[in-house]
Structures are given as structure tokens and as C-alpha cells.
Regions:
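Active-site loop of short-chain dehydrogenase/reductase
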Residues: 6, 80-83, 97, 130-144, ...
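Structural signature of the Rossmann-like NAD(P)-dependent dehydrogenase/reductase core
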Residues: 10-11, 88-89, 137-143, 186-191
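Rossmann-fold cofactor-recognition segment
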Residues: 48-62
Length: 242
């Protein structure tokens, strides 16, 4: 994948996996806009990374769309064309006691609005132009706890598990709708593993940099539609059942 005059948007980019993803894309020569919820943190992270930023709560779909439009207009004014890379690395964990029969409406809606609904908002706003231009990569951070072939069936953390299972289904469905890579548009989900982030905790076995590596690879890899695959769930550059 040539990175000449390419640009990306990374949600959740002010810390953790999103920050490391943005860092890797910048190292690959891609101009990046990060999105974070906290204004000061996003500003500080953007300064360290040497990129642009916007602050917004992605759970507010109206404001989130407005920010995505604003970023696109700003990028266009700087000479960029259609968005090349969209990485959706934002996310929240549901309350540890949120089993299906114990959780409440507020916790359910909070988790799904961020983990799943905001994925739809971003893709629905940005990906039509990418698909029409027959280009672009969308990478969505999912989780192994959302795998219905494995950990996702073990119960507990219901809003989180189900939101991530929804992400996996969303990616697969979108890939079929857009030609499974044959038209130049790629969409994939990743399981980063248990990483040392604010969500994962300091005792997690993997660093955020390790967790972000597959996302960076998917966003920048060369793709041959005759042999390579998209619309899948990946872990450490390997396809896993979803």
C-alpha cells in the first residue's frame, strides 16, 4: 500500500490502543487525526504524536457526525482526497456485574452506544465515499470476548460481549455488501488481546503497542483480491473464528 498523501482518522486515539495505532500509522507516513473524549488529553496526545485532533463523546451520534464532517472538510482544505484509513479504537467495558438478568437499561445503552452504535455512525458517515472511490481501509477494534465461537459464549459482562459480537457481525456484513475487497474497499475487525491499557489494567500480559500491531498492519498491508481476505476477525495477523 503506497502511503503518498494518505490520511487517517483514529477514534480512541488519545490513549492506549488507539494512541499506539495512530503512532504506527504516522510512522508509516500517514497523516492522522485522532479523536478522544477528553479535550486536554486529546490535545496533549496530538502534540506528542505530531498530528491533528478533535474531542467529542462518540456516544453522542449527532455531535460525532458533526466532528467527522469537520475533520473531512479540514483534510480536504489541506489537499487530501477521500479518507484512506479509518480505525475505530474507542470502547468501554461494561460493569463487571452486568450479567444479562442483572444489568439495567442505562448500563446496556451506555455500552452499546459507544462500542457498537458509534462504529455504525463513523462507518455510515465516512465509508460511502471510500467505497465509491474503490479505496480505503476500515479497521475496528473488537475483542475475544465477543467471539461466539469461544470466549463470547461464557456469560457475564453481557453488554460488552454482545456489543463486540455485534461489531464482528457488522464487519462481516459490510464486507459482503462492498464486494469482499474486490472493489478496493477493505473492512476488518481485530482482537488485540488482553493489553496494558486503562481498560485492561497494568497486569495484562501484552503491551498496547503489541495489541495495536495487527491494526496497523491491516491498515497498511498490500492487498491482492485474488488471494487475500477481508471482512474477518484477526488476532496477531491470523484469522480467528468469530
Amino acid at each position: 500500500m503506497s502511503d503518498s498523501k494518505k490520511w487517517a482518522i483514529v477514534t480512541g486515539g488519545s490513549r492506549g490502543l488507539g494512541y499506539e495505532t495512530a503512532k504506527g500509522l504516522i510512522a508509516a507516513g500517514i497523516s492522522v487525526y485522532i479523536i478522544g473524549k477528553d479535550e486536554e488529553r486529546a490535545k496533549d496526545s496530538a502534540k506528542t504524536l505530531g498530528c491533528s485532533y478533535r474531542a467529542v463523546d462518540v456516544a453522542d451520534s449527532k455531535k460525532f457526525r458533526e466532528v467527522l464532517i469537520e475533520i473531512t472538510q479540514d483534510a480536504t482544505s489541506k489537499g487530501f482526497e477521500v479518507l484512506d484509513v479509518l480505525v475505530l479504537a474507542h470502547g468501554v467495558m461494561s460493569d463487571k456485574m452486568s450479567k444479562t438478568l442483572r444489568t439495567n437499561d442505562e448500563e446496556w445503552r451506555r455500552t452499546l452506544s459507544i462500542n457498537l452504535d458509534a462504529v455504525f455512525t463513523a462507518v455510515n458517515q465516512l465509508a460511502p465515499a471510500m467505497a465509491e472511490a474503490r479505496k480505503g481501509r476500515v479497521v475496528v477494534y473488537s475483542a475475544c470476548l465477543g467471539r461466539m465461537s469461544g470466549p463470547g459464549t461464557h456469560g457475564g459482562l453481557a453488554p460488552y460481549r454482545i456489543s463486540k459480537a455485534g461489531v464482528n457481525a457488522f464487519v462481516k456484513n459490510l464486507s459482503y455488501e462492498t464486494g469482499l475487497g474486490a472493489r478496493g474497499f477493505l473492512v476488518d475487525a481485530i482482537c488485540p488481546g488482553h493489553c496494558r491499557t486503562d481498560m485492561g489494567g497494568e497486569d495484562a500480559p501484552r503491551s498496547a503497542q503489541e495489541g495495536a500491531e495487527t491494526a496497523i498492519w491491516l491498515a497498511t498491508r498490500d492487498f491482492d483480491a485474488t488471494k487475500d481476505k477481508t471482512g474477518l476477525l484477526w488476532e496477531d495477523r491470523t484469522v480467528v473464528d468469530w
